[in-house]
Amino acid sequence: EDKRIQEICFGAYEGMCIGGEKMDPKSGEFNKFFVDTENYVPIDGGETVPQLMKRTGEFLRELCENKELSQKNVLVTTHGAAMTALLNNIKENFDVAAFWKNGVPANCAVTIVDVKEGKPEIIKENVIYYKEQVRTWKVGK
């Protein structure tokens, strides 16, 4: 386990109901994380998107530069925002406003990355290996 690839910390927003009858009145501010990411301001110990990008980027850099792993297959698993941050780091998309540009990887989706000379390259992205229909989770305004 590596804490650098844990899901983003939402602070006081953790567990907040953001829809339906029990929707929290403060959920509008929290919803900016999904629809207006550059204006999302975390509260009470929450983490910013740049902080998430930095820690996942450090993990990725260390992984790619580890010579002991150069001829090995490595499995990395995490949650949606952290995985999106990892993919954005690989694609060098550091624009917070475009954080969700490619959506959220589907549940259990597989992305294959090849590392050559310390540089990661996406070979296949968001491949699904199960047959059951799963609702796509989209982020957008």
What positions do the PLM features span?
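Conserved histidine-centered catalytic loops in small-molecule metabolism enzymes
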Residues: 1-4, 32-35, 112-141
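Domain-level recognition of soluble alpha/beta enzyme cores
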Residues: 93-121
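Short glycine/proline- and acidic residue-enriched helix-loop micro-motifs
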Residues: 29-51
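Glycine-rich phosphate-binding loop signature in dinucleotide/nucleotide-binding domains
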Residues: 63-72
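Active-site signature of alpha/beta-hydrolase-fold catalytic machinery across serine-
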Residues: 85-89
